[in-house]
A protein has these predicted regions:
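Short hydrophobic targeting helices and cationic amphipathic motifs
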Residues: 4-7
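Short, positively charged and aromatic/hydrophobic N-terminal segments
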Residues: 9-20, 24
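Flexible, Gly/Pro-enriched loop and linker segments at secondary-structure and domain junctions
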Residues: 29-57, 77, 152, 160-167, ...
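Aromatic-residue-lined binding/catalytic grooves and analogous aromatic/hydrophobic interfacial grooves
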Residues: 32, 58, 68-72, 87
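Acyl/amide activation-and-transfer machinery of modular secondary-metabolite enzymes
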Residues: 49-67, 108-132, 208-214
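Hydrophobic "lid/gating" helix adjacent to the active-site nucleophile
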Residues: 74-111
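Helical lid/core segments from catalytic subdomains that handle acyl or acyl-like groups
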Residues: 117-176
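Active-site-proximal acidic secondary-structure segment that organizes catalysis
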Residues: 189-240
Length: 240
């Protein structure tokens, strides 16, 4: 009995320290001068809305990614999370957040994605910063998901800027909406992009999937969504 108590205590302390370590991370955050920002008018216009979010659906050719992950024995899901996070972190418009009508530039967003333990139908959360390469990310994602998964509440305690991911691999998804707390007075400061995709399907010798990107119009326009889609496709096509 004493052994079980000690074990449970160790698990609780380990999880507590894991969460606390996130708060110790130091990320660059620099306020943007709105008077010299070329999107000042757009920011102020869309700031009038309590919920300035919108969602765009588009198709992604994942043929090369599927071949790459099968050849290298990597998780397709973790790999696509990595590539999407990489893409987000290469576009300036996605590296901004707001607070009290101020805009800040940040240096990166971390991936926050759901996962399922084998045999379970109840998802947990994994939060992971960008790693040195796709192999390191997939390895670390597997380790975190297996040995140190986060509850929904724990993931909310991690204050690092995020890219939020979900996946519906059971159906050929065409689009989706995302839950939001419309009673939250600070909802318009929610600037975390939300990326969701469905299962990939084969047609005419290619594998494609539908992806949705949910963003905040105070910071991100359709042009930037187009940048994301094209850049992601280019990165996938360049895998070898």
């Amino acid at each position: 009995m004493a052994f079980l108590i000690d074990l449970l205590y160790t698990i609780v302390i380990f999880n507590k320290l894991s969460i606390e370590n996130w708060h110790k991370r130091t990320l660059m955050r620099k306020e943007i001068d709105l008077n010299t920002w070329d999107r000042k008018e757009h920011f102020e216009f869309f700031s009038r809305n309590a919920t300035p979010h919108y969602c765009v659906a588009f198709n992604v050719d994942v043929t090369n990614l599927l071949h790459f992950t099968r050849t290298n024995k990597l998780s397709f899901y973790y790999s696509l999370v990595y590539l999407c996070t990489q893409t987000v972190n290469e576009i300036d418009a996605f590296l901004m957040e707001t607070e009290d009508n101020k805009v800040y530039a940040i240096d990166q967003r971390i991936a926050s994605f759901i996962d399922l333990a084998k045999g379970s139908t109840v998802f947990h959360v994994v939060c992971l910063p960008q790693q040195q390469d796709i192999f390191a990310f997939c390895s670390q994602a597997r380790e975190q998901s297996t040995n140190n998964p986060l509850t929904l509440q724990q993931s909310c305690q991690i204050t690092d800027p995020k890219v939020i991911f979900s996946c519906l691999p059971w159906l050929d998804m065409t689009t989706c909406t995302n839950e939001r707390d419309y009673t939250d007075a600070k909802l318009k400061d929610d600037t975390a992009p939300i990326i969701v995709w469905g299962k990939y399907i084969q047609k005419d010798g290619k594998f494609t999937l539908n992806m949705t990107l949910d963003v905040n119009h105070r910071l991100i326009d359709g042009y930037h969504v187009g940048q994301f889609a094209q850049k992601l496709q280019n990165i996938i096509d360049s895998l070898c």
